[in-house]
Amino acid sequence: MENEYWKCSGHGTFVKAADGKDYYLYHAYNKKTNVFSGRQGMLAQLNWPAKNVWPVLKEKSGPSLNRDLKLNFTRPQIDKNWQWDFRNSTPGILQKNGQLHLSGIINKDNLSGIALTVRPTSTTFEATTTVTNTNSALKGLVYYGDAGSAIGIGIAGNEIEFWKVENKTRTVFAKVRIPTTVPVELKMKTADDLNLLVSFRKPNEEWQNVQAKEKITVNFLPQRDRSPRIGLLFNGSVSQDADFSTFELKY
């Protein structure tokens, strides 16, 4: 099935609802974000117009929901939206007293670190977090495709760092030394053309952009079945951790 908004539908399952109606639960790619945002869940009703004819699938639109996500880590249970790359790291995740503590073991060939992420429903979004601890590990935000394709902003010691990993090479676009360290808020914002802006601030102060020498795009991140995720980053030793008090994703 294809319409004005969706394409390449398939790989679905027929289900019967409590009211006796038949539905097709499947996936498709959004035409606007193309393969960058990956497959998304779809639902269509199965109708039989008459005997001995092909069935008809009619898409069903659900209610419009607020897709924004805001987490403050007040409960011990981690949010069900979190995902991580188990092939390239073994994260340790602890929520306590309004803090999420992220640590763990990073595979030797993993240059990106541990990424605790959620799957965005659009290529354009604004993600923010608050880092609350100080050490030499890099702690912050990451837009993560896999261990060899990621980009982010973080703080290590008293330096803000804007970085990416591509083709097994880690590049630092810019560093900004700040007089005091934590807490510090970090932000990543993507645009329709896949350009990326990153910034930081102390709580209740103005945002300061971290400028690279050229425009930075995220179009190198994996697509289709490995569509990139946005979330929290820890890149340090097993004796360190990254502490966060907030994470927010807005569309």
Sequence positions of predicted segments:
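Carbohydrate-active catalytic/glycan-binding domains of CAZyme proteins
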Residues: M1-Y251
